[in-house]
């Protein structure tokens, strides 16, 4: 059953594929209202030409296709890198970062068009339904949200195909891939189908962004990444905007097989899910940025930030991009990045990204203090008093418990 609350105009997150094409027609049929299709270009590399015509033929009153690649890199990927966001210590959150941006853009279209409802094609078992809907609830709490997969009676792909045929929906019926794929500027994710067996190795033909490490170039490639306040602004001296940085690093690091991850992660809804990810550019940025922090942020601030990065990643993964807690966490992260300026030299070789050098005009690393040679600034005799005070709790605990 559909929601009882009447709606007048719906903005649908639309890809032009089987699911959202069926949803478009089903929404019009079920709610008897105008449906506006919205497509975001977040670097998925899909053919977007002809999508507007397809949406209109399927029944959309209007089709919006927005290029959000620069905004995605600048306002979502780069802040995640600044915060060292890594979910469960392994996942760089590519899909999680794109969803709040799409929700934000859909809200803007809804306000422009006077729409009072949103619809999406996320299933009731995944994380994306939460991310989309929390985004809308945070930005447009008065709007209605429609999630067809939680409402209708279609059981799966075969039911959708039959419905599409019966309604004359213009979709190309192809052999279903043995897994699902989601691509954007940050990564490509693969899950489901044959990948549901966590012991089965992925087929090498599956990977689109990265060369097999075994077949990667036999010579390493070195890059110098320039950072300003935690953001990469140049590669090998060439100034680039955030979108260009991601495009360049995806190509270069992908050629060397960098950024493959095969994990089982804990979904927000409580299900464990196997995911295989290609994140070449994001991997290089993550490692280089964290390394630069090691010479530009003091110890106590860095340690606290490292702890907060776990919470930051969970907030992103769980769809809380626009929450008050996220704003507070990001404010702290932004403050820590004031001096994260400098250059990092990385070495790419057969699936690995190694940091081989770093420098900064505001570095806290003092070779005169760190030297193993005759010191000028550090008096080793001072260490004895420090250790006596620092070790006092341990010493007293041991002494008193021996009584």
UniProtKB/Swiss-Prot annotation:
Pfam families: Arginosuc_syn_C, Arginosuc_synth. It catalyses: L-citrulline + L-aspartate + ATP = 2-(N(omega)-L-arginino)succinate + AMP + diphosphate + H(+). Its main location: cytoplasm. GO terms for biological process: argininosuccinate metabolic process; L-arginine biosynthetic process; urea cycle. The keyword DNA repair does not apply. L-citrulline binds at residues 91, 96, 127, 131, 180, 189, 265, 277. PROSITE patterns: ARGININOSUCCIN_SYN_1, ARGININOSUCCIN_SYN_2. Its EC number is 6.3.4.5. Keywords: Amino-acid biosynthesis, Arginine biosynthesis, ATP-binding, Cytoplasm, Ligase, Nucleotide-binding. It is an enzyme of class 6 (ligase). Pathway: Amino-acid biosynthesis; L-arginine biosynthesis; L-arginine from L-ornithine and carbamoyl phosphate: step 2/3. GO terms for cellular component: cytoplasm. The keyword Glycoprotein does not apply. GO terms for molecular function: argininosuccinate synthase activity; ATP binding. L-aspartate binds at residues 123, 127-128. NCBIfam families: argG, PRK00509.1. This is Argininosuccinate synthase. It comes from Leptospira borgpetersenii serovar Hardjo-bovis (strain JB197). The gene is argG.
């Amino acid at each position: 059953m559909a929601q009882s609350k009447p709606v007048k105009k719906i903005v649908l997150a639309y890809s032009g594929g089987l699911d959202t094409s069926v949803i478009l027609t089903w929404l019009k049929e079920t709610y008897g209202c105008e449906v506006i299709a919205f497509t975001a270009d977040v670097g998925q590399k899909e053919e977007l030409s002809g999508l507007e015509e397809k949406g209109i033929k399927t029944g959309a009153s209007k089709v919006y296709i927005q290029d959000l690649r620069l905004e995605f890199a600048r306002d979502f990927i780069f802040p995640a890198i600044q915060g060292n966001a890594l979910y469960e210590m392994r996942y760089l959150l590519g899909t999680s970062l794109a969803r709040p941006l799409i929700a934000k853009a859909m809200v803007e279209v809804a306000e422009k068009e006077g729409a009072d409802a949103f619809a999406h094609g996320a299933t009731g078992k995944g994380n994306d339904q939460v991310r989309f809907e929390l985004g809308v609830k945070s930005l447009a709490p008065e709007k209605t949200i429609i999630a067809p997969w939680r409402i209708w009676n279609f059981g799966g792909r075969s039911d959708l195909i039959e419905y599409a045929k019966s309604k004359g929906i213009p979709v190309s019926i192809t052999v279903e891939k043995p897994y699902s794929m989601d691509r954007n500027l940050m990564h490509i994710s693969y899950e489901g189908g044959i990948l549901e067996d966590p012991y089965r190795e992925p087929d090498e033909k599956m990977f689109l962004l990265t060369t097999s490490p075994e077949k990667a170039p036999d010579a390493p490639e070195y890059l110098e990444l320039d950072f300003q306040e935690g953001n990469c602004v140049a590669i090998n001296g060439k100034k680039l905007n955030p979108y260009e940085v991601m495009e360049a690093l995806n190509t270069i690091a992908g050629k060397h097989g960098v950024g493959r991850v095969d994990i089982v992660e804990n979904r927000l809804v409580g299900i464990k899910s196997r995911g295989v990810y290609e994140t070449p550019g994001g991997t290089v940025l993550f490692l280089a940025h964290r390394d630069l922090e090691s010479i530009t942020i003091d110890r106590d601030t860095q340690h606290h930030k490292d702890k907060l990065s776990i919470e930051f990643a969970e907030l992103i993964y769980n769809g809380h991009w626009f929450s008050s807690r996220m704003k507070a966490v990001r404010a702290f992260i932004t403050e820590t990045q004031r001096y994260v300026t400098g250059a990092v030299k990385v070495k790419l070789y057969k699936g690995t990204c190694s940091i081989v050098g770093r420098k900064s005009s505001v570095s806290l690393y003092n070779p005169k203090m760190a030297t193993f040679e005759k010191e000028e600034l550090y008096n080793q005799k001072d260490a004895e008093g420090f250790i006596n005070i620092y070790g006092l709790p341990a010493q007293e605990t041991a002494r008193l418990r021996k009584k």
